[in-house]
């Protein structure tokens, strides 16, 4: 029962902080470019507007066009539940073993790639091929990096790794650990389509990866795709932040511990973003 409560807290935290994180990132980028931007609340307004619209699908489209957005959103929610964002308490029936987390991450990646191929356009196929090339480089890097960090711990469960690193400050300065964290930062940039690997705000065909795959989607489908991609970014950033700075993560399900975990998790995510 306690573990289920922690999972619900993880999901609520991820759903609440994700639009804020995206809003802060967009606002900072806009200010650096000399623009005012749409404000921190703009992502919320964009998603709610898209979810209120009916999707337009081509008459010859298959089930992939409607299933891919749901699959991406579902995999992102599962990823948010498994990654120790707020607490290191694991759900016994759904272990956060590294292979499970990477498999869930890959599920969303494949859903996006199939969506790009489903459109039958040159842009969609190009985006899907680029996306899978990036995935082929990213997934093994995630496994090797976290296994390098987990060596002294003796476990591949992410919550156990974070908990062990929080009580062993010396392991944070280990050269292997530092190099693995740097590799994970590069992985997050590549997997979530951020600069310089991809530009999420572009429509230039030479630089499109994520945008090329969702170019034919609209309405509710596009809303799920956007929010699902944002959730993946939140989960991966939270994982890297808690592996690099594992302090403030709740070790129990007490109210004070969870509140501290939520507060420190929010600060880490906003700084990492």
Where are these regions (language model features)?
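Alpha-helical transmembrane segments of multi-pass membrane proteins predominantly involved
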Residues: 1-273
């Amino acid at each position: 029962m306690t573990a289920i409560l922690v999972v619900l807290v993880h999901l609520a935290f991820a759903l609440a902080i994700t639009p804020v994180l995206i809003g802060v990132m967009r606002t900072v980028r806009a200010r650096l470019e000399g623009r005012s931007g749409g404000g921190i609340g703009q992502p919320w307004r964009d998603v709610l507007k898209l979810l209120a619209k009916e999707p337009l699908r081509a008459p010859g489209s298959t089930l992939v066009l409607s299933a891919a957005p749901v699959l991406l959103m579902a995999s992102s929610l599962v990823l948010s539940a498994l990654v120790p964002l707020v607490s290191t308490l694991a759900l016994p029936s759904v272990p956060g073993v590294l292979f499970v987390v990477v498999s869930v991450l890959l599920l969303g990646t494949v859903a996006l790639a199939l969506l790009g191929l489903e459109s039958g356009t040159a842009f969609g196929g190009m985006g899907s091929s680029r996306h899978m090339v990036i995935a082929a480089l990213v997934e093994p890097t995630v496994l090797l990096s976290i296994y390098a960090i987990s060596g002294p711990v003796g476990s591949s469960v992410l919550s156990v790794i974070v908990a062990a690193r929080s009580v062993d400050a010396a392991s944070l300065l280990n050269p292997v650990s530092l190099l693995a964290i740097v590799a994970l930062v590069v992985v997050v940039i590549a997997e979530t389509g951020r600069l310089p690997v991809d530009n999420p705000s572009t429509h230039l065909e030479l630089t499109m990866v994520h945008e090329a795959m969702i170019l034919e989607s609209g309405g509710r489908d596009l809303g799920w795709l956007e929010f699902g991609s944002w959730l993946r970014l939140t989960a991966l950033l939270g994982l890297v932040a808690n592996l690099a700075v594992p302090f403030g993560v709740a070790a129990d399900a007490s109210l004070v511990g969870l509140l501290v975990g939520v507060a420190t998790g929010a600060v880490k995510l906003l700084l990492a973003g």
